Amino acid sequence: MDLIEQNQQYPYFLMPGATTLGMVFSEGVMLASEKRVTYGSFVTSKAGKKVFRITDHIGAACAGLVSDMQILIREVEAYSNLFELDVSRKISVRSAAKVMSNLLFGRRLFPLITQTIIGGMDDDGPSIYVLDVLGSVIPDKYAAVGTGAEIAVGVLEENYTEDMNLQQAKDLAIRAMKSGISRDSMSGNGIDLLVFMKEGMSEESVKF
């Protein structure tokens, strides 16, 4: 049975949509995702949360099944806290990304259906990493994942500069997210922003 036949027989066995992005800017890291949660063609929630705090200096933005995102983030958060208790220092962004990679690869036969951008601030400065469902870890300066990613990453590609300040990064993130949402029926209903800087973490929701 091919995928088309499967989807005809099980019309709701479909990948959920999302538009999610992350970027490094001069003062820190910006993560963003929209709020719509879909089940097939039905919008199950207009207030889904797809950006997550892992520690005070690391967070993640995800696209995929919300339940799988939540399980993955809880496990990475637990390992990060255990690391800090064990060695009396905070886990680095790179190490947290590797922990997430190992968890995803360990589930490769029954994968967690989520693409993830993990990022934050540590002693090496701001950084982000992109992970697929099998745990591949790709460092980058900016990235977008999800069904609206092709449109969003085009806006980032055209306008991104690493020396952007916080306001410029926020404006670009919102612009890229709105562009992705405008062409993706499975994304929408506002944007959640998560920012990590030396001064700490901040969250913001943008309605439109």
Model-derived features: positions:
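Long, low-complexity N-terminal extensions
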Residues: 1-208
